[in-house]
């Protein structure tokens, strides 16, 4: 009888650390990095990677896809900010506020519910506004009407509009024009918010390709 083993991958954290250093060396001075560890760190182990880079001063925090992934990191002792890039269902808002998770906000109704939950718990919920500049997933449209909505969101009690972000759809292509157009739209929307007195602490949009090839997109 033959015995078979399941396929597995052995991850060398020294190699992962080297990759982080390579990314850092391409960052614009003063720009921090978000460690994206969704889907279990793309199969490399979200928890051990997050624990390894927690002490890196250039790591602002982490990004995941779901509330479950965020809670896994929190319960493993991760203290830095955790941003959920995808949709968060209302039944998870209590945990979002309780465990200080950053949700991506792209609807006024969502922001209102998060604000109400934060008031109920006596805490502040820090949100990152998602603007769609060309990826065509989730996000506010980059227009004046959306800017007015974000202004309303910024005035909700116990809610901090901490960040504004978008996602490049084609930054890894040789032709950088589509990504440059997205960056231009993002910056224009950011100015619309500034004109309305909306205070955003963190502006971010670069993915890996953006870090390497679009220095002008290395923001906060």
List the model feature ranges, each with a label:
Residues 1-102, 108, 116, 124:
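A charged N-terminal "starter" segment
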Residues 4-5, 39-56, 116-118, 123-126, ...:
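Active-site loop/helix belt of alpha/beta enzymes
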Residues 66, 85, 108, 130, ...:
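Proline- and acidic/polar-enriched loop/turn elements at helix boundaries
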Residues 102-112, 142-148:
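Glycine-rich anion/phosphate-binding loops
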């Amino acid at each position: 009888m033959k015995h078979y083993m399941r396929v597995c991958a052995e991850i060398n954290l020294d190699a992962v650390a080297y990759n982080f250093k390579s990314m850092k060396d391409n960052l614009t001075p003063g720009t921090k990095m978000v460690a994206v560890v969704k889907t279990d760190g793309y199969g490399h182990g979200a928890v051990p990677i997050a624990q390894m880079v927690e002490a890196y001063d250039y790591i602002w925090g982490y990004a995941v896809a779901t509330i479950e992934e965020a809670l896994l990191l929190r319960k493993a002792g991760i203290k830095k900010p955790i941003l959920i890039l995808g949709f968060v269902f209302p039944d998870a808002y209590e945990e979002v506020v309780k465990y200080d998770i950053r949700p991506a906000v792209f609807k006024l109704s969502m922001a209102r519910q998060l604000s109400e939950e934060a008031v109920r718990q006596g805490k502040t919920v820090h949100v990152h506004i998602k603007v769609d500049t060309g990826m065509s997933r989730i996000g506010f449209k980059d227009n004046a009407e959306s800017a007015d909505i974000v202004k309303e969101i910024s005035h909700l009690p116990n809610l901090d509009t901490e960040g504004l972000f978008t996602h490049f759809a084609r930054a890894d292509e040789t032709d950088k024009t589509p990504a440059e157009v997205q960056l231009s739209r993002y910056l224009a929307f950011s100015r619309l918010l500034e004109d309305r007195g909306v205070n955003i602490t963190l502006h971010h949009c670069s993915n890996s390709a953006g870090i390497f090839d679009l220095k002008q997109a290395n923001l906060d």
